[in-house]
UniProtKB/Swiss-Prot annotation:
Stretches assigned to the LCN-type CS-alpha/beta domain: 3-28
Lineage: Eukaryota, Metazoa, Ecdysozoa, Arthropoda, Chelicerata
Species this chain originates from: Androctonus crassicauda (Arabian fat-tailed scorpion)
Keywords annotated in UniProt: Ion channel impairing toxin, Neurotoxin, Secreted, Toxin, Voltage-gated sodium channel impairing toxin
GO MF: ion channel inhibitor activity; sodium channel regulator activity; toxin activity
Annotated tissue distribution: Expressed by the venom gland.
Purpose of the protein: Binds to sodium channels (Nav) and affects the channel activation process.
Family (UniProt): Belongs to the long (3 C-C) scorpion toxin superfamily.
Disulphide bond pairs: none
Protein name, UniProt field: Toxin a
Length: 28
């Protein structure tokens, strides 16, 4: 799951860069 916030998106609409912990995706 993406954490809402101001972050760039990759071509799949996922935050990048990010760190994935379990089922959670933390945008950094």
């Amino acid at each position: 799951a993406d954490v809402p916030g101001n972050y760039p998106l990759d071509s799949y609409g996922n935050c990048y860069p990010c760190t994935i912990l379990g089922d959670n995706q933390y945008c950094i």
